[in-house]
Amino acid sequence: MTREVVLVGACRTPVGTFGGTLKDVGSAQLGAIVMGEAIKRAGIKAEQIDEVIFGCVLQAGLGQNVARQCMINAGIPKEVTAFTINKVCGSGLRAVSLAAQVIKAGDADIIMAGGTENMDKAPFILPNARWGYRMSMPKGDLIDEMVWGGLTDVFNGYHMGITAENINDMYGITREEQDAFGFRSQTLAAQAIESGRFKDEIVPVVIKGKKGDIVFDTDEHPRKSTPEAMAKLAPAFKKGGSVTAGNASGINDAAAAVIVMSKEKADELGIKPMAKVVSYASGGVDPSVMGLGPIPASRKALEKAGLTIDDIDLIEANEAFAAQSIAVARDLGWADKMEKVNVNGGAIAIGHPIGSSGARILVTLLYEMQKRGSKKGLATLCIGGGMGTALIVEAL
């Protein structure tokens, strides 16, 4: 008999902007904060955790096994094991579905899952410095790990922004459509922040400073804008292109976590779950149009669950770019159902801390489902390199 898997204790840090409040707070620190908070929210003891699975993409220079560092810093006993996964933008969500698989297999009852990323602290790399340079360093030999490891398609040698331009060409998506999508994201995120919509899901980050502690408790990436101002932004990746800073996601820092648990263990401990895991899937596409990844992933997850998109009450689809978000909406049949998609804005406004984003959208989905009384929810992301991942949950 297949074990039922539930989610409890979900939380996230606020999302920091590039060069912003969290720029000096490392990935291991951010991860430890959400792990500690998730344990408190779930009402369990740290020693009851069987395993930790956490996503992180930009791991160069962080030291061995970031997930292990996070858990030790969070006070989880050394006897508990941990591993870090890198499925690029899908890492945080895949960590959760991996945890569900382990629990379904009967190999664990309680798993800490999620993701962490500080893109600000990604190092520059000298890949040929091991054996020295005869004279000057060759041009192009200094690699920005943030750009290369997080934002570059290695198969074609170009920025993720070009993959969005490719989708625009394929689908005939206009600059006006992209800007309208970006403006929607900013507007909804601003409304959510102003009304305190995210307060329940956020754990503040306390940053010690010479003039006293800074309590960081609000997403800082959203920007006030107007359609007119967005229309004036120059193309960011291609001459004559239409992808701009206003219709693309940001470079950010954050962490998010959720405790994945067998339903029988939750019942035994008297814990009321936030939701149960219904299905999950991944899918592959051509790397040059990586933003289409949510299409096969979501279709597979829906098919496994015996559902259609009409059965889903709430959707969190990561906004890597407006271009890919529009294409995904068209193909998956929710372009005319946007009232249930990214209802509090998405990554264009909130930000995209790559290793954490999958867990972030899941946390946001779970709390918004509670507020609305929604029954079924879908979280999905595109993944650099040409993939997508998706997870469907049902409120309990």
Swiss-Prot record:
Disulfide bonds: none annotated. This is Acetyl-CoA acetyltransferase. It is found in: Cytoplasm. InterPro entries: Thiolase, Thiolase-like, Thiolase_acyl_enz_int_AS, Thiolase_AS, Thiolase_C, Thiolase_CS, Thiolase_N. Belongs to the thiolase-like superfamily. Thiolase family. Pfam families: Thiolase_C (PF02803), Thiolase_N (PF00108). It catalyses: 2 acetyl-CoA = acetoacetyl-CoA + CoA.
